[in-house]
Amino acid sequence: MIGVILVLASLLSVGGQLCQKQATRPLTVGGRRRHLMLWLGLALICMGAAMVLWLLVLQTLPVGIAYPMLSLNFVWVTLAAWKIWHEQVPPRHWFGVALIISGIIILGSAA
């Protein structure tokens, strides 16, 4: 169960980051203030929920085990930026993502 909470905390944190990115996207028509408030509001909600879940994780797992798992955030953000905004991700970056996933598997199996 704590693993699910950890993944959810990570996804909510990433969601907050992605909402912040979306808030900075240019608009072709009016409504900039509304756009900004919507996405920043969603970012605050996601980040706040992630923090609450993170505190639950820290009550159960040692920080030395839990914290490295947040490296998943780099993986989620890379995938989302590539898929949502069609950002270019060079092969070297994909290799780094693979290394992060490998490290998480190694650390997770030690827990």
Swiss-Prot record:
List the membrane topology term(s): Multi-pass membrane protein
Write out the entry's keywords from A to Z.
Answer: Cell inner membrane, Cell membrane, Lipid A biosynthesis, Lipid biosynthesis, Lipid metabolism, Lipopolysaccharide biosynthesis, Membrane, Transmembrane, Transmembrane helix, Transport
Q: Which InterPro entries match?
A: EamA_dom, Flippase_ArnE, Small_drug/metabolite_transptr
Main location group: membrane
Q: Where in the cell is it found?
A: Cell inner membrane
* Metal-binding found in the keyword field: no
- Write down the SUPFAM superfamilies for this protein, in alphabetical order: Multidrug resistance efflux transporter EmrE
Q: Which residues are listed as membrane-spanning? A: 38-58, 61-81, 91-111
Against NCBIfam families, the record matches this protein to: PRK15051.1
Q: What is this protein called?
A: Probable 4-amino-4-deoxy-L-arabinose-phosphoundecaprenol flippase subunit ArnE
Origin species: Salmonella dublin (strain CT_02021853)
Which lineage do the record's taxonomy fields give for this organism?
Answer: Bacteria, Pseudomonadati, Pseudomonadota, Gammaproteobacteria, Enterobacterales
